[in-house]
Amino acid sequence: KKSLHRLQTIRLKNENSVIGYLDIYHGWPKKNILWLGDIFLHSKVYGHNYGREIIYNLIKEIKKFEYKYMRCSVRLKNWPAIRFWARVGFSKVVGYLGDKDYGVNKFADLILEMDINARRKEEWME
């Protein structure tokens, strides 16, 4: 059986240098959902809209298949990541996981979802 998990390196087109990786699960937790396990970009490329471009191109690719949604989880204490995911269209909270009470060594994640057909191309440049 083909694995649902894929780890993809992210490279700059012109330089072919690795700037990060993308960790995805096809059809998890449901057949019509693509789960983004991780997206990591090197700090040297922050602020150049590579994250937005990666998500936009990923959506273009997965629209060719039967996916309707993408999901990811984000730590509640990670404000830059929450802002990023909201900006690229992960605006629906579909769940949460983690510790039940707050503390320094405690964690909690929001599970966010995007309807991949809800965003228009022109919205990506806002």
Where do the PLM segments sit?
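Acetyl-CoA-dependent GNAT
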Residues: K1-Y46, I55-N57, E61, F65, ...
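Terminal substrate-recognition subdomain of acyl/acetyltransferases
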Residues: R87, Y102-E126
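Active-site-proximal loop/turn and secondary-structure-junction residues that shape catalytic pockets
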Residues: F40, L76-N78
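Short glycine/proline-centered loop/turn elements that form peptide/ligand docking sites
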Residues: G51, I55, N78-A81, G98-V104
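Short glycine-rich hinge loops at helix-strand junctions in the catalytic core
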Residues: N49, E66, G89
